[in-house]
Amino acid sequence: MSDSTNLTIAEETLALLEWPRLCQHLSTFTQTPLGAIAARYLLPPSQWEESRELLAQTQAVESIENSPESNWHFKGIADITEPLARVERGGLVTGLELLAIAGTLAGVRRLRRVIEERDDLEILQTLVAEVRTLPELEQAIHHCLGEDGKVAERASPKLGEIRQKLKAVREQIQQKLQKIIQRQSNALQEAVITQRGDRFVLPIKAGYKEQMPGIVHDSSASGNTLYVEPQAIVELGNKLRQARRQEQTEEERILRQLSDQVLEVLLDLEHLLAIATRLDLATARVRYSFWLGAHPPQWLTPGDEKPITLRQLRHPLLHWQAEKEGGPAVVPITLTIDSQIRVIAITGPNTGGKTVTLKTLGLVALMAKVGLYIPAKETVEMPWFAQILADIGDEQSLQQNLSTFSGHICRIIRILQALPSGVQDVLDPEIDSPNHPIFPSLVLLDEVGAGTDPTEGSALAIALLRHLADQPCLTVATTHYGELKALKYQDARFENASVEFDDQSLSPTYRLLWGIPGRSNALAIAQRLGLPLAIVEQAKDKLGGFSEDINQVIAGLESQRREQEQKAANAQKLLQETEIFYQQVSQKAASLQARERELKSYQDQEVQQAIAAAKEEIAKVIRQLQRGKPSAQKAQQATEILGQIQAEQKAKVAPKPIGYQPTVGERIRIPSFGQTAEVTQVNATAQTVNVTLGLMKMTVPMADIESLNGKKVEPPPKSEPVPKKVKAEPPATEAKSPPVLVRTEKNTLDCRGDRLERAESRLEKALNQALDAGVLWIIHGKGTGKLRQGVQEYLSHHPLVKSYALAPQNDGGAGVTIAYLR
């Protein structure tokens, strides 16, 4: 950017908005060398259709990235532009470069496979539809080359023969040299075989040169050692050199053959490389957007009456500084611009964030054009801007030896020249053709009209902004001129905004306020910076009462704005609390309804059981009367029994309402574990609950749990015991006490070391065998807990299992699950 006179105003705007810095940040998220280069030199497209396609590609790659099983990476894809260019010039490709080509083919083939396996990636399927990954070329390269890039013997029979010959000659040379070392060891400085160039030599003492005839190829720095090729191996050395030349010739022939194959598919390789770069860029856009916490923009088309909505918008470069370089936290701004607004005048003190607001808006408009997401809260709604044109800063003025005012005017002239000629309403659907919509431009003006006499500068700024209001653009301008604040009340296409100033701390808050013009606060800032108070007071006197009254009115509006914002925040908080309360009440009502249904079901079961018992008793009486000879005594007994049954049924009353009962989704406490857990299933009949405790799922008796506020589960009331029945038969034998559960080999399954499938198969068999015992101990061990979870998941759905729980600590604890059978 050293010679800005050669740049268009759109290109110069990229520099003013620090677009190259953002591109550099984006490049750090790429995975290929060409992707990084493309990201660093990324330019926004000039057509809306291209931006729409880029955004769709970003969203498609995001869906791939969000899939946990996707094999989406760019390993193996290299920058092969140099070897491709050399091949086009008739040059030779090296072995390592050929391997890079093969790796690139394999990498792109893998990416294409991921895309083709999905039905929802039409935009990417279209992108890779014409890509040829050339498996034949890849196979030929791997057949001819080893992993180190050297030509392999399998590449040709001739090469294999040459290398066998080389091996034989080397062995002959080694054998002869070993014999010389053994015979003339006194002449050697060291008993080693070394090389000088491509010749084998021995280190000979200088004084023994005459005893070792041969060719001297080198000497030590001191001259005490001569490196001599003994005469006995000179001829073999010549044969070795000749064989090496033959090997080199054959290797070059094979590389030439592979290079010619590359040349034949050069256009396919260049296209493949371009597509890989575009996919890498799309992936980088996704990852950079994710890092920013950004959301995709929804385009507002010309004629759309929706407002531009950018809530909690953050400057991406300041966010980078805060996160990566330890800079201050970014203060987000909110932009909501109605569709009829054409010009926004931002006023307020210096260093208050006016220029940052301009740059933020300009940068995110560029980001949207290249397919990046916007660092703002959802939903992001904004138009596609045909051009982003800015006049920010005085760099151009300094470079061209212009005054500040002249520099601004020259740049504004270029902005006006870049806008479409003629006065058109881009937001009027009657003017725009549906097939050829006129997209607006975005014009950003910093300190419009500054650098000259305030009266003339203000008049010029008003005229300029009124002219821009008639153009197909949205203009955002910062200013200190109070006259510009009044334009809103004269023309509905104008809007005011201001950067907030804290009168208490005498410092800006960097928040953007809409609808209220700002105060320059020059005197307050001067006082905060240390200017003597007497000077500040004298300036206030010179300023006059009318100006002070205006500032007081604006200050009052700002105070009312803050008060309304506080009330809105309180109302929002109250709304959130109400929603939470509503959810809690709804959950409680659902819980009560569930308990009512459960209670009714329980009562129905009790009634059915009582009816069945009564029928059985009556049947017994009838059978007794039918078996023996009727007598008055038996008839009397039967009458008494029937009366007793009738009295029992009349005495039946509805059970008491059940007290605390756990519900699905509720968190409860298990005192024996000292942990809380979440209820996933309630079995009222078995008086157990299924709970999730960390990674464990288990069944726990209700008697062993309590609510978070300490309430114990109240068991359902038992039916009144039926009085002892008067029977005609001999009295029944005394009821047996429940059997004691005893662990034996027959009711114990050890599945440690089993895979889950085998464990389930063995568990099914063991459950059937343990039916008589009524209980089954399953030893699964502790380990990672995966086998335990699988076993307990299997038990929770098995019809033979009534409940299950972890064994006591003295019986295996978390390594053993006890299943109680029906």
UniProtKB/Swiss-Prot annotation:
SUPFAM superfamilies (UniProt xref): DNA repair protein MutS, domain III (SSF48334), P-loop containing nucleoside triphosphate hydrolases (SSF52540), SMR domain-like (SSF160443)
Transmembrane stretches, start-end: none
Segments of this protein annotated with the region Disordered: 707-737
UniProt keywords, alphabetically: ATP-binding, DNA-binding, Endonuclease, Hydrolase, Nuclease, Nucleotide-binding, RNA-binding, rRNA-binding
Keyword Cell membrane: no
Biased composition annotated in UniProt, kind: Basic and acidic residues: 709-728
SMART domains attached to this UniProt entry: MUTSac (SM00534), MUTSd (SM00533), SMR (SM00463)
Regions annotated as coiled coil: none
InterPro entries: DNA_mismatch_repair_MutS_C (IPR000432), DNA_mismatch_repair_MutS_core (IPR007696), DNA_mismatch_repair_MutS_sf (IPR036187), MSSS (IPR046893), MutS (IPR045076), MutS2 (IPR005747), P-loop_NTPase (IPR027417), Smr_dom (IPR002625)
Enzyme class: hydrolase
Record-listed E.C. numbers: 3.1.-.-, 3.6.4.-
Residues where ATP binds: 348-355
Segments forming domain Smr: 749-822
Keyword Glycosyltransferase attached: no
GO biological process: mismatch repair; negative regulation of DNA recombination; rescue of stalled ribosome
Record GO terms (molecular function): ATP binding; ATP hydrolysis activity; ATP-dependent DNA damage sensor activity; double-stranded DNA binding; endonuclease activity; mismatched DNA binding; ribosomal large subunit binding; rRNA binding
Binding partners and assembly: Homodimer. Binds to stalled ribosomes, contacting rRNA.
NCBIfam families in the cross-refs: mutS2
Record PANTHER family: OS10G0509000 PROTEIN (PTHR48466:SF2), OS10G0509000 PROTEIN-RELATED (PTHR48466)
Function field: Endonuclease that is involved in the suppression of homologous recombination and thus may have a key role in the control of bacterial genetic diversity. Acts as a ribosome collision sensor, splitting the ribosome into its 2 subunits. Detects stalled/collided 70S ribosomes which it binds and splits by an ATP-hydrolysis driven conformational change. Acts upstream of the ribosome quality control system (RQC), a ribosome-associated complex that mediates the extraction of incompletely synthesized nascent chains from stalled ribosomes and their subsequent degradation. Probably generates substrates for RQC.
Family, per entry: Belongs to the DNA mismatch repair MutS family. MutS2 subfamily.
Protein's name in the database: Endonuclease MutS2
Gene name tied to this protein: mutS2
